[in-house]
Amino acid sequence: MNQYKNFIMQFEDIVGNNNVLIDEPMKKHTSFKVGGPADLLITPTTLEQVKDSIILCRNNSIPYYIIGNGSNLLVRDGGIRGVVIKFLKLGDIKVEGDRVIAQSGAPLTNICNEALKSNLGGLEFACGIPGSVGGAVTMNAGAYNGEISQVIESAKVIDKDGNVFLLNKEQLDLGYRMSAIQKYHYIVLEVTFKLHNSEYDTIKNRIMDLNRRRTEKQPLEYPSAGSTFKRPEGHFAAKLIEDTGLKGESIGGAQVSEKHSGFIINKGGATAGDILNLIEFVQNKVMEKFEVDLHTEVRIIGEENN
């Protein structure tokens, strides 16, 4: 039974009637296309609504989870007890000189395109990363020798008590797939990037080259959450998996991609359970062969199916 239905009217007062969904299947909101229902899913349209929603959750001991476009997220088949706050409608982007300021829900691709229009370079590496900027900053996303830490200036965040404040680059403490945001459970509201002036064609050609390489090497035609595992120190996850003989290995509808072993894909009809079982199988086999512990890069939330 959905124990949070009593709060529907209060959330509707904050975000509007059309922005509250009940027992919403999370497979509609993740790039893996799997996941059970969330008790409530709300989509705020202003940063003030985010703050008010978090305070309502805190004051009533309601668990809440923040998502962007769900591109680095695996929701278990039992779904989510509590409230999912989706930043889909918080995607404003503005350019001020050599700075690009974006709300947390803005897709990285949109930010890159705005930078391109203003002849600002530095974000080319991020143009093919499918996530939104809030998640990208939280995990210090990166690709092709670039990462968020190289271009970020500051981030406006909110804590669990509803306090809003600004963190500079040093305070964000960005490392490999980690940040102070993760450590202290902050939520990113807005991000400022400091870029550099460049030629339009130079930026455009770099973006096109990286996207071509992605298309050639990554299984973009299947649902996935991007790279499934973090890079272990001194190794590459994909090479360890391939050298263990697991390329193409499958459980149910989940498969280790034959195109890129670092990706676990939904080949068709997968459940979250299939994907989780395959992740565990890969981890165990790599540990047996190489004594290397693979840690997931994908964020895993939700309840097991009863």
UniProtKB/Swiss-Prot annotation:
Enzyme class: oxidoreductase
Domain FAD-binding PCMH-type: 34-198
Record-annotated active site: 177, 227, 297
Cofactor: FAD
Protein's cellular compartments: Cytoplasm
EC number assigned by the record: 1.3.1.98
Pathway info: Cell wall biogenesis; peptidoglycan biosynthesis
Lineage: superkingdom: Bacteria
GO CC term, one of those recorded: cytosol
Gene Ontology terms: biological process: cell division; cell wall organization; peptidoglycan biosynthetic process; regulation of cell shape
Catalytic activity: UDP-N-acetyl-alpha-D-muramate + NADP(+) = UDP-N-acetyl-3-O-(1-carboxyvinyl)-alpha-D-glucosamine + NADPH + H(+)
UniProt keyword terms in alphabetical order: Cell cycle, Cell division, Cell shape, Cell wall biogenesis/degradation, Cytoplasm, FAD, Flavoprotein, NADP, Oxidoreductase, Peptidoglycan synthesis
Cited InterPro entries: FAD-bd_PCMH, FAD-bd_PCMH-like_sf, FAD-bd_PCMH_sub1, FAD-bd_PCMH_sub2, MurB, MurB_C, MurB_C_sf, Oxid_FAD_bind_N
Molecular function terms, GO-annotated: FAD binding; flavin adenine dinucleotide binding; UDP-N-acetylmuramate dehydrogenase activity
Pfam families: FAD_binding_4, MurB_C
The protein's role, per its UniProt record: Cell wall formation.
Cited NCBIfam families: murB (TIGR00179), PRK13905.1 (NF010480)
Record family assignment: Belongs to the MurB family.
Protein name: UDP-N-acetylenolpyruvoylglucosamine reductase
